[in-house]
Design a protein with these regions (language model features):
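Conserved functional hotspots at enzyme active or ligand-binding sites that engage polyanionic ligands
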Residues: 1-114
Length: 114
């Protein structure tokens, strides 16, 4: 997909190198959080990695069955990445309910009472 632009809700394969510490690494599936309008204009996109190692952490979002990808979205590991140089490839699309649940967990994490 040479003209592919990642869009919110897409499941993509992306190179997560380099990484450090507890961050997810390697070529792996990730969920796109940002809309294609932003991604196309800026050349960056917001991603959350997907893991098959479900551990019951409070910020995991379980991916429903019936999709190509399985496991959980790590909503507390948001990354802004240059999707063009990281060999981003479309793989699947998650239902809107999954994106909504991911955003709810992010809102909880980022809550600010200033």
């Amino acid at each position: 997909m040479r003209n592919y632009i990642p869009d919110r809700g897409d499941v993509v394969w992306i190179d997560m190198h380099p990484q450090a510490g507890h961050e997810q690494a390697g070529r792996r599936p990730a969920i796109v959080l940002s809309p294609s309008s932003y991604n196309a204009k800026v050349g960056l996109a917001l991603f959350c990695p997907v893991t098959n190692q479900i551990k019951g952490y409070p910020f995991e979002v379980i991916i429903p069955s019936g999709l190509k990808v399985t496991g959980a979205i790590l909503s507390d590991q948001v990354k802004s990445l240059d999707w063009k140089i990281r060999n981003t490839e479309f793989y699947d699309k998650v239902p809107e309910t999954v994106i909504f649940e991911t955003f709810k967990k992010l809102a909880t994490l980022l809550r600010f009472n200033g």
